UniProtKB/Swiss-Prot annotation:
Species annotation: Flavobacterium johnsoniae (strain ATCC 17061 / DSM 2064 / JCM 8514 / BCRC 14874 / CCUG 350202 / NBRC 14942 / NCIMB 11054 / UW101)
Purpose: Transfers a GMP moiety from GTP to Mo-molybdopterin (Mo-MPT) cofactor (Moco or molybdenum cofactor) to form Mo-molybdopterin guanine dinucleotide (Mo-MGD) cofactor.
GO cellular component terms listed in the entry, alphabetical order: cytoplasm
Listed name of the protein: Probable molybdenum cofactor guanylyltransferase
Cofactor: Mg(2+)
Keyword Amino-acid biosynthesis: no
Localization in the cell: Cytoplasm
Keywords on record: Cytoplasm, GTP-binding, Magnesium, Metal-binding, Molybdenum cofactor biosynthesis, Nucleotide-binding, Transferase
GO biological process, one term: Mo-molybdopterin cofactor biosynthetic process
A GO term, aspect molecular function: metal ion binding
Protein residues bound to Mg(2+): 94
Length: 190
């Protein structure tokens, strides 16, 4: 695959976490630093989709959402609008267990025909760990204009590729949405 840009969707304040989600600490480090650590062996082209000054300590370009209050789809729209590469790795900011190996698998198995490539097990699809092609921007724009913001609805509209994973691999793709989920994660790892 030609050059790739990574965009981390930092979202905003999480009501369930009471703070910026990407800055929640896990093993003494913010979530976002775990994610960046997994990306760096692959590319240094990393940009953050956020308007928050709380991420200013990181040496990466920060891009505020072009459209507000449109959830992850708005973040992906912003990312692809600013991207200079055909292929883009889009990641949410709440996946501290993501590994370089899983990201490399995603990148190596992506085919040019697919507008989106994501992981899925029998029980769960992971749309916010994916390769997104810049060419699907018009489809995302239409979805936002129609207020059709569900990620699974977007997948249904776009030629996409699902990389099947075992149920046990879901663990590394887990997104942490609440303090309870973070506690569960810490217990599972101890």
């Amino acid at each position: 695959m030609e050059t790739l840009t990574t965009f981390i969707l930092c979202g905003g304040k999480s009501s369930r976490m009471q703070s910026e989600k990407g800055l929640v600490l896990f093993q003494h480090k913010p979530f976002i630093e775990h994610i960046i650590q997994a990306i760096l062996p692959i590319t240094e082209q990393i940009k953050l989709i956020t308007a928050s000054k709380e991420y200013d300590y990181l040496p990466y370009e920060k891009i505020p959402d072009l459209v507000l209050d449109k959830g992850p789809l708005g973040g992906i729209y912003t990312a692809l609008s600013h991207s200079e590469t055909e292929f883009n790795l889009i990641l949410s900011c709440d996946i501290p267990l993501i590994s370089t190996e899983l990201l490399q698998e995603l990148i190596s198995k992506h085919t040019e025909e697919a507008g989106i490539t994501v992981f899925a097990s029998e029980s769960k699809t992971h749309p916010l760990i994916g390769i997104y092609s810049k060419k699907i921007l018009p489809i995302i724009k239409s979805a936002i204009e129609a207020d059709e913001l569900k990620m699974m609805d977007l997948l249904a509209k776009v030629p996409h590729q699902i990389l099947n994973i075992e149920e046990s691999e879901n663990f590394h793709l887990t997104n942490i949405n609440s303090a309870d989920e973070l506690n569960d994660l810490n217990i599972n790892l101890s």
